[in-house]
UniProtKB/Swiss-Prot annotation:
Organism classification: Bacteria, Pseudomonadati, Pseudomonadota, Alphaproteobacteria, Hyphomicrobiales
Complex formation: Homodimer.
Residues annotated to bind NADP(+): G168, R169, S170, S193, I234
Entries under InterPro entries matching the protein: Aminoacid_DH-like_N_sf, NAD(P)-bd_dom_sf, THF_DH/CycHdrlase, THF_DH/CycHdrlase_cat_dom, THF_DH/CycHdrlase_CS, THF_DH/CycHdrlase_NAD-bd_dom
Keyword 4Fe-4S: no
MF terms (GO), sorted A to Z: methenyltetrahydrofolate cyclohydrolase activity; methylenetetrahydrofolate dehydrogenase (NADP+) activity
UniProt keyword annotations, A-Z: Amino-acid biosynthesis, Histidine biosynthesis, Hydrolase, Methionine biosynthesis, Multifunctional enzyme, NADP, One-carbon metabolism, Oxidoreductase, Purine biosynthesis
The protein's name: Bifunctional protein FolD
Pfam families: THF_DHG_CYH, THF_DHG_CYH_C
Pathway assigned to this chain's UniProt record: One-carbon metabolism; tetrahydrofolate interconversion
Catalysis: reaction(s): (6R)-5,10-methylene-5,6,7,8-tetrahydrofolate + NADP(+) = (6R)-5,10-methenyltetrahydrofolate + NADPH; (6R)-5,10-methenyltetrahydrofolate + H2O = (6R)-10-formyltetrahydrofolate + H(+)
NCBIfam families on file: PRK14186.1, PRK14188.1
Gene that this polypeptide is encoded by: folD
Amino acid sequence: MNNIIDGKKLAEEIIVKVKAETIKLRNNYKIQPGIAVIIVGDDPASHVYVTSKSKKAEECGFFSIKHMLSKETSEKELLQLIATLNSDPKIHGILVQLPLPAHINTNCVTQAIAFQKDVDGFHYINIGKLSCNTLEDAIIPCTPAGAMIMIEQQCGRDLSGLDAVVVGRSNIVGKPMAALLTAANATVTIAHSRTRDLDDVCRSADILVAAVGRPQIIKKDWVKNGAIVIDVGINRIAAPEKGIGKTRLVGDVDFEAIKGKTAAITPVPGGVGPMTIAMLMVNTLNAAARLYNLPVLKL
């Protein structure tokens, strides 16, 4: 049995549903979901991410606009743009691509986005709803939301009796991932780079989510037989076998060594990454639906 979770295939199945719901909104209610993506500066990786998100939004039938700002843009100017988008009825989702230049306070920017349009799920109100298990009208961060669908596909929605370990404590992935697993009745441990005996902690996991941002830190003997392994890490390492100066992408998990002992595992690339973009589309669609008190897409 193939135990490698195909994130591209699963994401495409979700996008098909988003497209269908978008057509319903347009035909029945004359509503077109709209997303605004903001990028500040000229970081090449950020531009790649923004382009892929914008293309996917257009593919889904959304109104999509990109704001490409110079790295000299002031925090005040960025906040003014966000205020304009907050009041724009055509825009239902606002995304500011991170990281921002050092002179801009990231927290001020993420909290300036109206929580109803916070399709990244970073606003304190959305974080609070998630923490309090009020998920019906919360906007969930895209990567944990996508990872959770992958876990549910393997284990079902009720994770009672299962031990889950999340390696990583970021506000973007680690903490919301732990909250989602807790809401699904798993027994959850949050571990990180300073956790004592991290290998032993990981070995206890029926479900192991690696989101620490260290290439291939999770070794074969850290994972118990039959575990579900979700690799959120995206790390670029040297690949001399490809030529001088060449690199390749790897996750936080030593994939080749571990894949044979897992019940299911996500690859990098092609695992959680496509699901992140798919869930951004779901969040934008649902933000538009909620604005008009219409049913949301449930996966």
